[in-house]
Amino acid sequence: MRNLLGGKGANLAEMNLIGVPVPPGFTITTDVCNEYFEKGKADVVSLLKNDVEKSISHIEGLMGLRFGDAENPLLVSVRSGARASMPGMMDTILNLGLNDKVVVGLAKKTGNERFAYDSYRRFVQMYGDVVLGMKPVNKDDIDPFEAIIDSVKAKRGIVLDNEMNVEELKELVSLFKAAIKERTGEVFPENPVDQLWGAICAVFDSWMNERAILYRKMEGIPQEWGTAVTVMAMVFGNMGNSSATGVCFSRDAATGENRFNGEYLVNAQGEDVVAGIRTPQQITKDGSLRWAKQQGISEEIRAAKFPSMEEAMPEIYGQLNALQDKLEKHYHDMQDMEFTVQEGKLWFLQTRNGKRTGTAMVKIAMDLLHEGEIDEKTAIERCEPNKLDELLHPVFDKDALVKAKVLTRGLPASPGAACGQIVFF
């Protein structure tokens, strides 16, 4: 199933079968991706047209919504999913189906105009980036959309994106569309069907983008595997303070400890958690306390401004904790999960076997063996030879670390402890 549906599509189907809440959707197989590059866009769109229309109708029936309808709109996400996990390499588009008429209907239906226009400006930005090719290629390239956002915030004296009001979000939509026209010569498509096909083809195209090609070479992933495309009904983490989005791990990916952990943001969507525009909060109270200690934040400020999900949304946390345990036991491995909470209802958007350090790799394999989740042969197979080298590097003594005075923190660029000259860049 994974070979055809990709890791994401296969795991979504499997989660649905075992009772984990996932939004309804459908997956276009990896075989179609290969045909896309062999036969061309026009032939593949023609071949898929009827099947995609039927699948959208099926989602409409399950959700009680209509794709492209101004009064009761169905919005969808379009996501890539190769059979091997390729985090961050492929493209995703959220909130697809919005246009100038649908956004008005969405605002009226939800009674939340800010949510509707926040979703719209995100969609226009993603569509411009992914489908119309406006995403910066190099690190130093200026992102035209982020430059517009920064300009609007500076003009209004705003610091954070979530402080923008409805009028400012409407202004962003207008400025984004003008930037698309100026840079690409194309008009942002108002027809949701055109948007859908643009997104599906863009995800197939992302299989051959520079990032994906380099990652495949590094990881030994064959080009002919292709990517699947998963189209799902949207669920929204940006509908207010009872909504959220987050990522979590069933065990510690750095140390391998059997410790549920992760981050979330209230009233946020998609990549906000990892984008750096807001400080994410920790899933567990224990994790929140450790984070606050590392950051030098008092308990009073932590509890008031950065409470854990366990404290702020105890019922949702209980469901999330139970389901992450269920998924780890189902897959017999540490899981990396993405979720959204829409007005108090939890939805899972993805699960996959989590990436881990060499130290965590060995500890997780041995712990799962002792817990009876895997056998000795599987435990040995889980220990990748190229990662065992990480265990041979010198490390700091744990007792010395406890006593040491921390000057600053950063992300390790290599395994083990290191000493040398500090270079600022």
For the regions a language model picked out, list residue spans one by one.
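Nucleotide/phosphate-binding sheet-loop regions of phosphoryl- and nucleotidyl-transfer enzymes
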Residues: 1-408
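Long, structured protein-protein interaction/assembly regions in large complexes
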Residues: 412-425
